[in-house]
Amino acid sequence: MTVIDNHEALAKEGDNGLSEAGARDYFELLKPRVMSLVVFTAFAGLVLAPGHINPVLGLIAILCIAVGAGASGALNMWYDADIDAIMTRTAKRPIPAGRVAPSEALAFGLVLSGFSVTILGLAVNWLSAAILAFTIFFYAVVYTMWLKRSTPQNIVIGGAAGAFPPVIGWACVTGNVTIESVVLFLIIFLWTPAHFWALALFKMGDYEAVGVPMLPNVAGVPTTKNQIVAYAVLTAIIGVVPSFMGFASLGYGVVATVLGVIFVHCSISVWRMPDGDVKMVPAKKLFAFSIFYLFAIFSALLIDRLVAVLMSGGVGGWL
């Protein structure tokens, strides 16, 4: 079945009326694994920002950011249902599996988008709400509907959507965007290509089948390997910048350096993969470590902040 045929089949399926979707199916539309990373980095931005926020408002902010991220995930699944049905990695998602009708997923995503942005604006501030609205739009429209199927630089440019959560968290506390929040943005933005291109290497067949122009399919594996190393190096460099800005301690800088060296080492292992390697073990290891790297970097920033607060004689600066 081609992408066009599958799109038409899904459209007809959506015209048959409401599905019998359960709460779990709608939860899957939110892309919970992606949401967990969004929530964590947003929380980091909120905690690391100078100043204080009422804990209740902080909780509302995190919930709104989580719901907004889930909403963009639902809109992404709605639009990509045709190719999701063909790719082995995504074929069991709620829409291609027939558990949720496309129209329901669209309505679900739109309602959650409006709800999350409105509540964040009313409860916290409108700058953070505006950035959240832009993030949802960028991911659902700019990336999903345009970049993903039109350019091999899709995840480079589209990666900005995943990099905004710490900026939103920061804006919730400060009401503005500063250079420190931009650094948090850049850590995720520069990390994204190596992370997703590692996945694209061992999922080339899937992307080829649906015509998504991922870099390995368009520019070839050697070029992709070079780009992965380049972005891994950039990620390692930006990862230590907070310690040089006085935004984090030397201890954090040491941890970030070690993590960065391992990240680059994993990328070099991918670069050294022989041509025609079917198993792509180094690429799979890089993909797995990249997830750990991002969680570890932001965890290190949070721990560094907590230690600084405790050493200053209290926990009042934690939130």
From Swiss-Prot:
EC number(s) recorded for this UniProt protein: 2.5.1.141
CC terms in the record's Gene Ontology section: plasma membrane
GO biological process, one term: heme O biosynthetic process
Family annotation (InterPro entries): Protohaem_IX_farnesylTrfase, UbiA_prenyltransferase, UbiA_prenylTrfase_CS, UbiA_sf
Lineage of source species: Bacteria, Pseudomonadati, Pseudomonadota, Alphaproteobacteria, Hyphomicrobiales
GO molecular function, one term: protoheme IX farnesyltransferase activity
Note: Carbon 2 of the heme B porphyrin ring is defined according to the Fischer nomenclature.
Keywords for this protein: Cell inner membrane, Cell membrane, Heme biosynthesis, Membrane, Transferase, Transmembrane, Transmembrane helix
Broad class of where this protein is predominantly found: membrane
Gene designation per UniProt: ctaB
Protein family according to the UniProt entry: Belongs to the UbiA prenyltransferase family. Protoheme IX farnesyltransferase subfamily.
UniProt-recorded name of the protein: Protoheme IX farnesyltransferase
UniProt-annotated location(s): Cell inner membrane
